[in-house]
A protein has these predicted regions:
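S-adenosyl-L-methionine
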Residues: 6-40, 74-104
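Conserved class I S-adenosyl-L-methionine
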Residues: 39-48
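Glycine-rich SAM-binding Motif I of class I
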Residues: 50-54
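Conserved SAM-binding motif I beta-strand of class I
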Residues: 63-68
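A short SAM/SAH-binding and catalytic strip from SAM-dependent methyltransferases
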Residues: 103-119
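C-terminal substrate-binding/active-site "lid" region of AdoMet-derived donor-dependent transferases
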Residues: 115-169
Length: 169
């Protein structure tokens, strides 16, 4: 069963990021870096066309939730998951990521901006369980040092991936 929910979203100036798709080679490396398995629940914040979650479900058996402010992208992602037979593992929600409950996530993926990542850091640290993994494409989190970084090449160029692991409380 595919769940698509819509929540009233009021964009805050400076929070919107352009819809720039993560190259598929980078998607695969993000999932590998986070060591995503079938036992994971992956949350993609700013899920765009759903490609990260679709790869996580299709290739690694994970479940996932995509949070996206653009209703057209939410519908597109949900339809693609349905067509691929992944609707029972994925849900896509039109929701402001600062309003979302992230507590079920074991992995969070991001391709936002350095500013948004830094603003999300307190939420991630307070809502995610110790050991949860966070992977960001291209953008760091200021003074929170990543556990690992990885350089990945694609047809679109070179990409830096950052991995953080939520520490124990």
């Amino acid at each position: 069963m595919l769940l698509v929910t819509a929540t009233a979203c009021v964009p805050v100036p400076g929070q919107d990021v352009p819809d720039v798709r993560t190259p598929l080679a980078v998607v695969n490396e993000m999932l590998r870096l986070a060591d995503v398995t079938a036992s994971d629940v992956v949350y993609d914040l700013g899920s765009g066309d759903g490609r990260i979650l679709i790869a996580a479900a299709r290739d690694r058996g994970a479940r996932g939730v995509g949070l996206e402010i653009d209703p057209a992208l939410v519908a597109q992602s949900a339809e693609r998951a349905r067509r691929l037979g992944l609707a029972d593992r994925l849900s896509f929600r039109q929701q402001d990521l600062f309003e979302a409950d992230l507590t079920p996530a074991t992995v969070v993926t991001l391709y936002l901006s350095s500013d948004l990542n830094r603003r999300l850091q307190p939420k991630l640290l307070s809502e995610l369980r110790p050991g949860a993994r966070i992977v960001s494409h291209s953008f760091d989190m200021g003074d929170w040092a990543p556990a690992r970084t990885l350089q990945v090449s694609s047809n679109e160029g070179s990409h830096t991936l950052y991995l953080w692991v939520v520490p124990g409380r």
